[in-house]
Swiss-Prot record:
GO terms for molecular function: 5'-3' RNA exonuclease activity; RNA binding; rRNA binding. Its main location: nucleus. This is 5'-3' exoribonuclease 2. Possesses 5'->3' exoribonuclease activity. Required for the processing of nuclear mRNA and rRNA precursors. May promote the termination of transcription by RNA polymerase II. Essential for vegetative cell growth and chromosome segregation. It is found in: Nucleus.
């Protein structure tokens, strides 16, 4: 999901949510590595259900970053088997294993998939060009390059999309491998495997969510079932919270351990020997994994989201749903994040603080079972809008300070004459203090009328030039003698021809030193001739003026003028650009400049456009919330803009009515035509390729080879926004569907929707019943089964692919030497999940046993009292001080300190009314306000009646 750095931020804020995975090491006997005993006790604790988001496995196995990529698709699939087996040995599920591969996505997700795949094709093209350049350079140096190496191209990662031949092969390979494990591994005898391949519509993680919701709807469901999901996406954390399952955790690679590894580049791979490649493969096989405990995260959130003295009952489940919803504003796969929010800048904390301040006045929460309370959302965004300009200014100031710090570090690194605060232990005279002229006033040899500092800075170049060519030394001396009477520290006194001739003499024997010297002298001369253009020294501690601030912005070029930026009504120029250049979010007037730069509209049309964008964004956040909590509300809806509105623009949204039409998902080939670039058309049947490449095609404009990439204020190129035209669904489907009659039978078989597949071993409790009802009876009937018996509920149907007992399943891979499997050792059926009778409720089910608490009182206090208290000023006007979740409390100084206060409290408990002498001061001064002080305190005395 598009929440960059969310896992890193979350694990640092709540450190106890992660723990390392304990792995059993395989034993080696006589040089043979024995497999791990799957049936043995799990050192990480027992687990019922494991869910694999397979795209998080297929991608790193097919194009890894830290090791050489597999040569063939068979090798990729063998790597998938090995990786999956390692994950299973860590988790060891006992009841259910669900393998979910991304199928056809909703239209809202296709826009992001389209951007990624077009960008991937562009990067692959650049990588192949770079490889060709490196090989050409090697050949120019006389190295012999094999033709096979020159002809080899990188594997197209866009093949990992539903409907391609690779995905069809992946589905067959997964069915074979799980059947092989069920037939041969005793630890799998009670395991029930569900495979949801690319022919089942929906994203992998959301198909898993649908499965969990369907199991919770079964009346026999065990509320203490333990769940684990494997994947790399940040949205798995939101999905884990959205299940409202008390025993849930996430398994993922340890990204912190991988930060220290240097990723080998492409030309490094070309130079590696077989031993070096094998060492990288072995190193990659040992990378550590982490558990992310959603139950511990729930503990943290119970402290973080606690709002005392609410006018309504505090419901942790509803509060967690609100927290998940607010995180959507910081980024997701379906909508751009709000301009003022960024996870790395603690935007989630800002939203939580606003939510806690606004919630008492809302009378209810922001969400309820996936539906939005738009009145509450409008109030939260209004508060965020009030802070928006301050957020932009603070971000700009931080960027300026960071840039200045980088410049200082660069200057200290490049300038060898800066002592960096250390005492110079060399008692010789520094080079800056050495005289450039002799005692008679004559210029020193080789000085070229430079200052002492210039001479010291260029001592290396002059020394190399003098040592490398005596003719250059003589020329420098002659130039010094000729200008003896015109000495100056400036370089403007000698002509261009003289400089060129002096440098030209030295080119023969020491070109590099002479060229460096020439460049530095010419640079000094240019600065001397144009003193107005030379940069002035900058004081890092001085606040920048208005002109300096303008010059320091990214718009320091011609676009940084104070006038309105030019409006473009057509397609932007292909290549990298930054539309934030002229917006200047840190200056007044940024609102109109933002819409002019991002949406290309004149000033008079901004208000009408803003309303349309806000309405679409409200529809978007409503769609995303329903997608996470109830399933896909519409397969055809999408956000029709590349950018988000400001938080201050969300006015009057409480009156909006948001509804969705469910529609139906695209077929696989229709999605391929929606998201693939023309460079990846080899993944499509031949009949569709001309639609992408033929200029006469009615949808040719959907597949530009060059397109603009907006940095959008980001520093890293991979975060840039790809500005592609949105697909016109009507035109696309009309063009694609007229080609369907030309498809072959094998091609039609990849363009269908199917059910999930259920695989069990012949020792499973359901085996005899399923075999008799589905494959022995002449009229097979669907078999319904409940959760209590095996931990799985649903309906089994006869296999649509023609599974037959007493036959063999053939291995689909030519590599690996894997055997064929007897179909008597396992059973394969089609599987359908139980139907949900009503919308899923965001509650903990009755009968659950809470997990053991992992947070200490100190951990909870660190969250509840996260703001420091010692700098809060004491005010005698209200006598209130902040005290964490209780917000404020009454306090006044008391004679005798805290011990006297405790004594007074004990006295008031023993005697309901204090004696009269306690109301007067012994010195005759004003009476102490003991009564009001006690009644206003939260330490209320007991009254006896």
């Amino acid at each position: 999901m598009g929440v960059p750095s969310f896992f890193r931020w979350l694990s640092r804020k709540y450190p106890k949510i992660i723990s390392p995975v304990i792995e059993d090491t395989p034993q080696v006997v006589d040089g043979v590595k024995l497999p791990i005993d799957y049936s043995a006790a799990n050192p990480n604790g027992e687990l019922d259900n494991l869910y694999l988001d397979m795209n998080g496995i297929v991608h790193p196995c097919s194009h890894p970053e830290n090791k050489p990529a597999p040569e063939t698709e068979d090798e990729m699939l063998l790597a998938v088997f090995e990786y999956t087996n390692r994950v299973l040995n860590m988790a060891r599920p006992r009841k259910v294993l669900m393998i979910a591969v991304d199928g056809v996505a909703p239209r809202a997700k296709m826009n992001q998939q389209r951007s990624r795949r077009f960008r991937s094709a562009r990067d692959a093209k650049l990588a192949n060009e770079e490889k060709a350049r490196v090989l050409a350079e090697r050949e120019a140096y006389g190295e012999m390059i094999d033709d096979a190496v020159k002809a080899k191209k990188s594997w197209d990662t866009n093949a990992i999309t539903p409907g391609t031949p690779f995905m069809d092969k992946l589905a067959a390979a997964l069915r074979y491998w799980t059947s092989f494990k069920l037939a041969t591994d005793p630890g799998w005898k009670n395991l029930q495997v569900i495979i949801s391949d690319a022919t089942v519509p929906g994203e992998g993680e959301h198909k898993i969510m649908n499965f969990i919701r369907s199991q919770r709807a079964d009346v026999q469901y065990n509320p203490n079932t333990t769940h684990c999901i494997y994947g790399l996406d940040a949205d798995l954390i939101f999905l884990g919270l959205a299940t409202h399952e008390p025993h849930f955790k996430i398994l993922r690679e340890d990204v912190f351990a991988q930060d220290n590894r240097r990723r080998p580049r492409q030309h490094d791979m070309m130079d590696m020997s077989a031993e070096e490649k094998q060492a990288l493969i072995e190193q990659d096989a040992e990378k550590p994994f982490l558990w992310l405990h959603v139950s511990v995260l729930r503990e943290y959130l119970s402290a973080e989201l606690l709002v005392p003295r609410l006018p309504f009952h505090f419901d942790l489940e509803r509060a967690i749903d609100d927290w998940v919803f607010m995180c959507f504003f910081c980024g997701n796969d379906f909508l751009p994040h709000l301009p003022s929010l960024d996870v790395r800048e603690n935007s989630i904390d800002i939203l939580v603080d606003i939510w806690k301040a606004v919630l008492p006045s809302l009378k209810t929460y922001l969400t309820c079972d996936g539906k939005l309370n738009l009145k509450g959302v409008e109030k939260v965004l209004a508060q965020l809008g009030n802070r928006e300009s301050d957020i932009f200014k603070k971000k700009y100031e931080q960027e300026l300070r960071k840039k200045e710090a980088q410049e200082r570090r660069k200057m200290l690194k490049n300038n060898p004459n800066v002592t960096k605060g250390k005492v110079d232990r060399n008692f010789t005279v520094p080079l800056e203090s050495m005289p450039v002229f002799d005692v008679n006033g004559n210029a020193a040899a080789g000085s070229l009328n430079l200052t002492n500092k210039d001479f010291a800075n260029m001592r290396k170049e002059i020394t190399l030039a003098n040592e490398g060519n005596t003719k250059a030394l003589d020329a420098l001396k002659r130039r010094s003698d000729e200008n003896r009477t015109q000495r100056t520290s400036d370089t403007r006194d000698f002509s261009q021809e003289e400089l060129e001739s002096a440098i030209e003499v030295s080119k023969g024997d020491n070109l590099s030193a002479a060229a460096s010297l020439r460049e530095r002298i010419l640079a000094k001369r240019k600065a001397a001739e144009d003193p107005e253009g030379a940069p002035e020294p900058k004081n890092p501690h001085k606040a920048p003026s208005a002109s300096e601030t303008e010059a320091a912005t990214p718009a320091s070029s011609e676009t940084a003028s104070q006038v309105d930026i030019p409006i473009s009504t057509g397609m932007l120029t292909p290549g990298f650009l930054d539309t934030d250049t002229g917006v200047r979010l840190f200056e007044p007037g940024y609102h109109d400049r933002y819409y002019q730069a991002k949406f290309h509209v004149p000033t008079g049309s901004i208000d009408a456009l803003r309303k349309k964008v806000v309405r679409s964004y409200v529809e978007g956040i409503s769609w995303v919330l329903l997608y996470y909590y109830q399933g896909c509300p519409s397969w055809t809806w999408y956000y029709p803009y590349h950018y988000a509105p400001f938080a201050s623009d969300f006015t009057g949204i409480s009156d909006l009515s948001v509804t969705f039409d469910l529609g139906e998902p695209f077929l696989p080939y229709e999605q391929l035509m929606s998201v693939l670039p023309a460079a990846s058309s080899h993944n499509l049947p031949d009949v569709f390729r001309s639609l992408m490449s033929d200029p006469e095609s009615e949808i040719y404009d959907f597949y530009p080879e060059e397109f603009p990439i907006d940095m959008n204020g980001e520093k890293m190129a991979w975060k840039a926004l790809v500005l592609l035209p949105f697909i016109d669904e009507t035109r696309l489907l009309a063009a694609v569907r007229q080609k369907y009659p030309l498809l072959s039978e094998a091609e039609r078989a990849r363009n269908v929707r199917r059910d999930e597949v259920l695989l069990i071993s012949n020792k499973n409790t359901h085996y005899e019943r399923f075999l008799a009802r589905l494959y022995t009876d002449p009229a097979p009937q669907p078999v319904n089964f409940r959760h209590f018996k095996s931990g799985l509920a649903g309906t089994a149907l006869s296999d649509a692919e023609g599974f037959r007992p007493n036959t063999k399943m053939l291995c689909p891979l030519a590599a690996g030497s894997l055997p064929d499997i007897s179909t008597n050792l396992f059973l394969k059926t089609a599987y359908r999940m139980p139907q949900l009778p009503a919308p899923s409720k965001s509650i903990l089910l009755n009968g659950f046993i809470p997990p053991e608490a992992q947070l200490s009182p100190a951990d909870r206090d660190a969250i509840m009292y996260k703001y420091p208290q010692r700098w809060n000023p004491h005010t005698m006007k209200h006598n209130l001080v902040p005290v964490g979740p209780a917000a404020v409390t009454q306090y006044q100084p008391r004679i005798g300190g805290y011990r006297a206060f405790l004594f007074h409290q004990q006295l008031m408990q023993d005697r309901p009314y204090p004696p009269a002498h306690m109301h007067s001061h012994s010195s005759g001064g004003p009476p102490l306000a003991q009564g009001p002080r006690v009644t206003q305190s939260r330490y209320q005395p007991r009254r006896f009646h």
